[in-house]
């Protein structure tokens, strides 16, 4: 397993083209830039290319959101058209970004707009949107492979319990992946935990 860490956010494009990751965790801001870049490229394209891009996005949206997301089998012509766009339009976009080998791209740290999530999924970029914290060893909940709902942060991970504190609306999380303490910070640890 090869691990790469991009220490300079301004160099992410260069790093991606060099590393070409299969898995990459990132924040929504990265995907906002991918989305903006794709839309700029579409806008600069000739009329026929714009129509192809738009059809590819429509096809992907229908295939991914109506069939792949629900676990249902897509009609043959739609599946064939989606497969063609995977090898051409979606593939070209992913190669341009450096993510053509990507199997999963967890996204968290801030809200991801439904418009951008829908676009990414429609062009066959395998994002998994979720919620978590350093204190929870990352993921509390995320999109399942099938049955996720855009606009949500997915479903709870196994062995995790979540409730909302009625006094302050704070999210309370319990489970095996929750940290035991802040290192050498007993007061912060005490403040971070409820009695149960």
Regions found by a protein language model. Give the residues of each.
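Residue-level signal for well-ordered alpha-helical positions
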Residues: 15-18, 37-38, 185
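Short, charged, surface-exposed secondary-structure boundary motifs
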Residues: 15, 34-36, 138-140
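Alpha-helical "lid/cap" subdomains adjacent to substrate-binding clefts that gate access
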Residues: 21-102
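ATP-dependent adenylate-forming carboxylate-activation enzymes
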Residues: 3-19, 25, 44-48
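A short helix-loop-beta submotif of the ANL/AMP-binding
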Residues: 1-4, 124-126
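Alpha-helix N-cap/helix-start capping motif
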Residues: 9-10, 28-29, 50, 110, ...
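Conserved nucleotide-binding/hydrolysis micro-motifs of P-loop NTPases
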Residues: 11, 30-32, 135
């Amino acid at each position: 397993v090869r691990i790469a860490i991009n220490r300079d956010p301004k160099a992410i494009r260069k790093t991606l083209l060099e590393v070409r990751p299969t898995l990459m965790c990132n924040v929504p801001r990265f995907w906002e830039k991918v989305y903006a870049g794709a839309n700029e490229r579409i806008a600069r394209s000739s009329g026929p290319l714009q129509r192809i891009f738009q059809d590819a996005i429509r096809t992907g949206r229908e295939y991914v959101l109506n069939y792949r997301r629900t676990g249902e089998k897509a009609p043959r012509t739609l599946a064939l058209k989606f497969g063609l766009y995977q090898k051409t339009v979606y593939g070209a976009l992913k190669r341009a970004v450096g993510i053509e080998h990507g199997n999963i791209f967890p996204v968290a740290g801030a809200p991801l707009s439904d418009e951008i999530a829908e676009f990414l999924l429609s062009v066959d970029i395998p994002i998994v949107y979720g919620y978590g914290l350093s204190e929870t060893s990352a993921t509390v909940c995320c999109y399942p492979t099938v049955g996720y709902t855009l606009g949500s942060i997915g479903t709870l991970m196994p062995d995790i319990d979540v409730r909302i504190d009625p006094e302050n609306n704070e999210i309370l999380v319990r489970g095996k992946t929750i940290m035991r303490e802040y290192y050498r910070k007993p007061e912060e640890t005490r403040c971070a935990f409820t009695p149960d």
